[in-house]
Design a protein with these regions (language model features):
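Conserved NAD+-utilizing ADP-ribose enzyme module
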Residues: 2, 11-133
Length: 133
């Protein structure tokens, strides 16, 4: 349906929460993840349209921060690709190692943002073995 799923954050500090929201919106395995952010104005200036769609994430305060870039045509995908490249060149990206992801999960569990029981069995097992939770 020519869409691209994205998460809206207010600041760079929310990137980790967005990464966990993304990961917990599906059955996932522990892995590293790359995240880049694009300013809303860049999307507007490239005529990229979006609409809010609640996510099926386990992070309840991120459910309504999920958006779809909609009606994407070939040129739009090219524009988004160029925006991503520009952001990477301007150091507006973050790489979360597998350990960073585990730490984010543990932090979310300890802050009661995430219930460990909502995680896939294999992920729970690793967190229990490595962190004793």
């Amino acid at each position: 349906n020519d869409t691209l799923s994205v998460w809206k954050v207010s600041n760079e500090q929310e990137l980790g929460l967005a990464a966990i929201a993304y990961l917990t919106s599906r059955d996932f395995k522990l892995t590293s993840i790359h995240v880049t952010w694009i300013e809303e104005g860049c999307l507007i200036s490239n005529n990229i349209k979006w609409e809010q769609e609640n996510a099926s994430t386990k992070i309840s305060n991120m459910v309504d921060k999920h958006f779809n870039l909609i009606g994407l045509k070939h040129d739009d995908i090219g524009a988004i690709s160029n925006l991503i490249i520009q952001q990477i060149m301007n150091n507006k990206f973050k790489f979360f190692t597998e350990k960073n992801v585990k730490d984010l999960l543990i932090n979310s569990i300890e802050n009661n943002t995430l219930d460990i029981e909502d995680l896939p069995r294999k992920v729970k097992k690793v967190l229990k073995e490595e962190y004793g939770i």
